[in-house]
Amino acid sequence: MTQTLADMRRDYTRDGLTEAQSPDEPFALFHTWFDDAVKTEQPPVEANAMTLATVDEQGRPHCRVLLLKGLDTQGFTFFTNYESAKGQQLAARPFAAMTFFWPTLERQVRIEGRVEKVSAQESDAYYQVRPLGSRLGAWASPQSRVIADRDELEGLIRQTEQRFADTQPHCPEHWGGYRLLPERIEFWQGRSSRLHDRLNYRSVDGRWTRERLAP
């Protein structure tokens, strides 16, 4: 018999999360959990994959999966086309939420905060270490815009390859990084009977407070 959606579930029994295990600020815990994910998660799961949610000018939410490409005590960095749908949404409403899910570890992290562009120098530094095809794609693809078909896209790629046939492509002005400056970070550890552990960090006047949330 085919399993129905209502019957699809798994119990979480791997680990717990206590206040005693958790530092006073969230970045150290995120680093620990991220390192655990890198060591534990196997393809097709990518440890740095996260869902990014933004809101358009009408208040409608949009989400998509991206890759985290930078992390420091300021925040979480990702790169994209500034003229894409998410780029336009962030220009109008510079706030976003990220969610990381690591199924093997039965862990999830939710991050919310304000978003700002990184410097042109930081964007260029990352752009230059990307594979050549990805660098050309940043020039060729009019991201999020309607195109006729795949042939149109491949034609744009060929034009871009010809344009940079004798030189290395540089970072286009319409492409670069954003940094999410976290105001809230929640760590979720799956537990048995859906009685999950949830530790929530909030930034208040530049200082982090920690609290437990009911599952």
UniProtKB/Swiss-Prot annotation:
UniProt keyword Oxidoreductase present: yes
Catalytic activity field: pyridoxamine 5'-phosphate + O2 + H2O = pyridoxal 5'-phosphate + H2O2 + NH4(+); pyridoxine 5'-phosphate + O2 = pyridoxal 5'-phosphate + H2O2
Keywords assigned by UniProt, alphabetized: Flavoprotein, FMN, Oxidoreductase, Pyridoxine biosynthesis
Disulphide bridges: none
Principal EC category: oxidoreductase
Cofactor binding annotation: Binds 1 FMN per subunit.
Cofactor(s) for this UniProt protein: FMN
Keyword Oxidoreductase found: yes
Gene Ontology terms: biological process: pyridoxine biosynthetic process
Annotated residues for binding of FMN: R64, V65, L66, L67, L68, K69, F79, T80, K86, Q108, Q143, S144, W188, R198
Cited NCBIfam families: pdxH, PRK05679.1
Assembly notes: Homodimer.
Similarity remark: Belongs to the pyridoxamine 5'-phosphate oxidase family.
Record's protein name: Pyridoxine/pyridoxamine 5'-phosphate oxidase
Organism: Pseudomonas savastanoi pv. phaseolicola (strain 1448A / Race 6) (Pseudomonas syringae pv. phaseolicola (strain 1448A / Race 6))
Lineage: Bacteria, Pseudomonadati, Pseudomonadota, Gammaproteobacteria, Pseudomonadales
